[in-house]
Structures are given as structure tokens and as C-alpha cells.
Amino acid sequence: MAIFREFDVNDHHDRSLEDRRRHRQLVEKSIKDNLADIISEESIIGQSKNKKVKIPIKGIKEYQFIYGDNSSGVGSGDGSQKKGDRIGKAIKDRDGKGNQGAGNQEGEDMYEIEVTIEDVLDYLMEDLELPLMDKKKFSQILSNNSPKKSGYQRKGINPRLAKKRTVVEKLKRQQGTKRALREIHGELESDPKNKLPENTTIKSRFPFKQDDLRYFRVKRKPKLELNAAIICVMDTSGSMDSTRKFLARSFFFVLYRFIKMKYNNVEVKFISHSTSAKVVTENEFFHKVESGGTYISSGLKKALEVIEENYNPAYWNVYTFYVSDGDNWSEDNSLALKCAKDLCKVCNLFSYAEIIPSPYGSSIKHIFQNKITDNNFTVVTIHEKQDLWKSLKKILNKELEER
């Protein structure tokens, strides 16, 4: 991108713009590096979007020369090295990071900043949306994420710089200046007394100035989207231990916050089940603890009942997300499979996330994968908290990957 330097010393230019841009880049990188810890932090589950979390961020150091240790010897390779490899690297003193023990080297400057949950999701999920959404009758959902360009303005940020318009403004100023110079030159020729000195030169370079810059004016217009209903089903049986339930709630919490942030008026229903299923409130879903056996069919059957009673597939885009450890009463597997197939028929997307599959017996995931061939069915496996973000990205991609 072209760099426009300030020539007018009297103009008040925002010199902190580059610092803010670099700070935002550091925040984005830090969020991505610490994502697993942020979205799986137990204290944020069920909290409002304004709940703040702390993330570490590296300080920005000025460039400086760093001298070597003047060690003797010459580094050499055997010909198999690639660009970027370090040859003849000596063993350095430890810096005390991680499990290395006490070190004797200077560490990095780290700072902690506070960001809200909404900011974290905004950084990460701006390119994600509910997949496979179709047009239905009586569209009602308003989406906030629909910025539109609306003319130009003199002030703005670099990403919104209108390059063509900026060049046009410069050319207009350049042509006006040339026209004025021709008029002055004609007056000088007509009157010999007003001739320029012999050593006078006219500069041919015509640089950009701050007054030439034009930026796109962006307005956010509410965009009418499509009817959507989200059904969240979670296994709360005894086989779902505290770790599994924690990962399941983390998965649903980030999913729920994404939906509430991205779409207005989306309807969300929460279902929890063991051997029987029931519709619960948001607070009960994220905080209530249950136990008992497992009938997966009970949760899926309850989802079908909710869809039949409230969300006609002819008018609604329905998305069902089910999370379990895959451990099911064997006699219930056939009924659970039938309910899963029925959900694929009435839903735009039926997604199953398996949390730390049980080492005992066969998992329901293998039955679903072998018996369900619908393109709107997707399966993810979550073994640890680092898998949460990858699983959500796979589910919320604009187009499902081919099976």
C-alpha cells in the first residue's frame, strides 16, 4: 500500500494511529495464542458479554544491536540445511521459562490487559456464520454484521483508504496548479519587468498531501436475515464426569455467545437429558448438575418434539447441536440412530460433538458415522480444551466440508 507522508507541518495528524494498529495486532495474536485457556475458563461460563478476562501480551521493544558471545569456531553444514535453519548453534544459558529450572538470562516483558468476552468473540468469529441457511417464509432475523460503503470522507483509518479516489483528488489539485502556473507564466511573458530570476527552477515532483486523502464512509445497515432456531442438547448423565461436563458447557457457551452476538432475535432452546430429557433455562443448562443413566434417544426425541411444536421447517432454519461422551445404553442405540436420522431430515444442520470418548464399549459416534449419510450431518471429537476452537470452526464454516 502507498505511504503518504505529511508535508504540512501545521496539520494535526494522528501520530498514534500506527501504535494503535500494532497494539491491535498484538492483542489478536495473544488471544489466538491463549484461546484454549480463555474459552475454557470456568469463571466465564454463563457470564454476560461484558465479563472481562485477562490475557498476557508482549511489550514492544525498540530495535537494537545485540552482540554475540564471541565464541570460537566456524559453523558448517552437511548440505541438507534449508533456508532459515541455524547452523552451528551453541548451547545457550537457560532463561528459566517453563520447566527448565532456574535460569540466568533476561526474560521478555509481559503485560496483562483486560478484554471482554464480546471482544474476544469479535476478534475470532467475524468470518463465521450459521451454515446451510435457506430462504424461508416470513423472514424476521436482523443481522448486525452488514456494513455498506456510503460515499467518501476526509478522515478515516488506513484500511478504509479509497486509493482511486485519493489519486483523483491529487490529479485535480495537480491540474489546477498547472493551470494557475500557465496563467502566471503568460502574465510574466507579457510584461518583461516581471521575469523570474535566471536561477529559478520549477519542481516537477508533485507529492500527495493530507488534503488529497479520501476514505470510504461505512454505515452499518440492519440486514434482514432468515428465521433460525438453535436447539442445544447436552448429555448430563453420570458418565459425563466433571471434566466432560465442563468441556461441554464451554462448547455451548461459546456457541451461544457467537449466535447472540452475530444474529438478533434468533431463538435458542436448551435441553438436558440422562434417561429422560427436559427443556431447561439458560441458567440451569450451564450450571445445574445431574446424574443417572444414559438414553441418548431421550434428548434427540425431545429436540424433535420442540421442533414439531414450535419451529416448522417450512418457515424456520433449524440447527441442532448435541454433545455427549458417546456412552449409551446398548438397547437404546437403534432408537437413538432413528432420532438422529429424523433430525437430519428437519434440520439445516445436525451436529454431534463427542467429549473425551469412553474407553469402555463402543461409542455412538461410530454408529452415527457409519449409518448416517446426510450431507447436513457433521461430527467432531473434543479430547481436551485445545480442541474446542477447532471443533467450533469446523461446525460454523460457511460451507460444510465434504464427508
Swiss-Prot record:
Q: Which family is it part of?
A: Belongs to the UPF0229 family.
Q: Quick one: where's region Disordered?
A: 71-109
Q: Which Pfam families match?
A: DUF444 (PF04285)
For this entry, the protein name equals: UPF0229 protein CKL_0641
Question: What domain of life is recorded for the organism?
Answer: Bacteria
Listed Basic and acidic residues bias regions: 80-97
Q: Which InterPro entries match?
A: Spore_YhbH (IPR014230), UPF0229 (IPR006698), vWFA_dom_sf (IPR036465)
NCBIfam families given for it?
Answer: spore_yhbH
Question: Per its UniProt record, what SUPFAM superfamilies does this chain match?
Answer: vWA-like
